[in-house]
Amino acid sequence: MLATLSQIRAWSTEHLIDAAGYWTETADRWEDVFLQMRNQAHAIAWNGAGGDGLRQRTRADFSTVSGIADQLRRAATIARNGAGTIDAAQRRVMYAVEDAQDAGFNVGEDLSVTDTKTTQPAAVQAARLAQAQALAGDIRLRVGQLVAAENEVSGQLAATTGDVGNVRFAGAPVVAHSAVQLVDFFKQDGPTPPPPGAPHPSGGADGPYSDPITSMMLPPAGTEAPVSDATKRWVDNMVNELAARPPDDPIAVEARRLAFQALHRPCNSAEWTAAVAGFAGSSAGVVGTALAIPAGPADWALLGAALLGVGGSGAAVVNCATK
């Protein structure tokens, strides 16, 4: 069924222009965030398997994001060009309608063309009827071209962006272990774990964060951690955000290391308060600008702000935590 005359008059490509701008901005934002992560991962003086793993991961993720960004830029180009094509097709329809009206015909909502002159000789009436039919045919032809242009642009956009939302980042890289490895002394038939909140016999923690590195963050039994509640909440948030990563994931390891240092080697109160406040602001900003990044924007935004200094405040946290 063809569109009505009112629908054709109101036909708009504003959504395509808006989408093109949003896709371009999003592509630039994604690449900027992940490029900064990759570059600063290479600038960090962190040697060994963990540092190699971080650099490998940020390189791979930047490559993935660059591919997605290119798709969005292609979609933006299609949307802009398509908007021009559709606008031209819509104008062609309206020109045909105006031609019919200028010739003394009425164009109805259903695109039918009727003569406004009812009393005229039979020969003239027959000629006018033939003219009306020709004008109606031309209008309908142009409407068909308009609908076809809209459908073509829609199909091109679907083909270009269809898999963007399904992109997944590669899993954590496999890091070869050296001959010397950290070991724990957990026994499957060991003592019964203590109740929640009590110190674990091995110095670790029971519950979902019982890996050796996370357990290091617990303050010594019977002592107060020399940090504020805000710092503790920050550490808890970091661990919770990265809990889905495997314990030996280099990124999770480094995040836990930073959290450990925050608990055990804090700056003075004023410095740490400023650093945490800055981190909170930049983290929220990165999460906001990382909208629609598939597969894990929260943990990357957190690590990007805290470890790699996105927006500068993450660097303040690193400097403060490692004093």
UniProtKB/Swiss-Prot annotation:
Keyword vocabulary terms for this entry: Cell membrane, Membrane, Signal, Transmembrane, Transmembrane helix
Name recorded for this polypeptide: Uncharacterized protein Rv2077c
| GO cellular component terms listed in the entry, alphabetical order | cytosol; plasma membrane
> Topology with regard to the membrane?
Multi-pass membrane protein
Renumbered to this chain, the signal peptide range is 1-45
Classification from the root reads: Bacteria, Bacillati, Actinomycetota, Actinomycetes, Mycobacteriales
Bilayer-spanning residue ranges: 269-289, 290-310
Q: What is its main location?
A: membrane
User: Which residue ranges are recorded for the region named Disordered?
Assistant: 186-227
The record's subcellular location field reads: Cell membrane
Organism of this sequence? Mycobacterium tuberculosis (strain ATCC 25618 / H37Rv)
